[in-house]
């Protein structure tokens, strides 16, 4: 369950998108029914390549991790983190996605990258493993890919500042509504 006293990363990404005029790209096609069920199934399926990659790299996959920045009052619910078996600190975060399109680069999806960089900030790391299950509308069949994406700290910090501005806009909006 979400902490009602904290701002969730996804809320801040949605607000940043709205402020930037990107809110129209959020909603799925009307032809996709019960999209959350497909997403949950894809998330379960796409854990397998993460586990396989962890076996190859002597790493562990901690699933369903909640990270908080209590100073900034922000919480993130990650699909997981990757750690070396003998280290307590994350090497990478895991963010599992499903897309109803042909295979493409996740770097082209602004929302994905904004969410991932926020999670990286919370986890104090710079690498994301992003398994994506693609459901194309035509040929070919379903495709699964595991992307490993590294960001510069400066990119992560710039994204974090964008989300802090979105948080502040939500706070200002709430104050104005009460007046």
Predicted regions and their residues:
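A structural signal for short, well-ordered beta-strand segments and their strand-loop junctions
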Residues: 60, 93-95, 127-132
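Short coil/turn motifs at secondary-structure junctions
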Residues: 85, 99-101, 135-137
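Metal-dependent nuclease catalytic regions and adjoining charged, substrate-binding loops involved
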Residues: 106-109, 122-179
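Short beta-strand-loop-alpha-helix junction that forms the active-site gateway
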Residues: 95-108
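Metal-dependent nuclease catalytic cores that hydrolyze phosphodiester bonds in DNA/RNA
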Residues: 1-92, 110
């Amino acid at each position: 369950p979400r902490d009602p006293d904290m701002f969730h990363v996804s809320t801040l990404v949605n607000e940043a998108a709205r402020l930037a005029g990107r809110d129209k790209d959020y909603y799925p096609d009307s032809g996709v029914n019960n999209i959350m069920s497909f997403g949950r199934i894809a998330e379960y399926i796409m854990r397998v390549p993460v586990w396989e990659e962890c076996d190859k790299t002597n790493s562990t996959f901690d699933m369903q991790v909640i990270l908080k920045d209590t100073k900034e009052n922000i919480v993130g619910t990650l699909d997981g983190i990757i750690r070396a078996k003998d280290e307590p600190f994350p090497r990478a975060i895991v963010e599992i996605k499903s897309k109803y399109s042909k295979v493409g680069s996740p770097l082209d999806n602004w929302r994905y990258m904004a969410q991932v960089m926020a999670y990286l900030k919370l986890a104090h790391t710079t690498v994301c493993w992003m398994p994506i299950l693609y459901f194309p509308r035509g040929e070919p069949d379903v495709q699964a890919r595991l992307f490993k994406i590294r960001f510069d700290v400066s990119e992560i910090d710039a994204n974090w500042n964008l989300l802090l501005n979105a948080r502040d806009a939500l706070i200002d909006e709430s104050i104005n509504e009460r007046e």
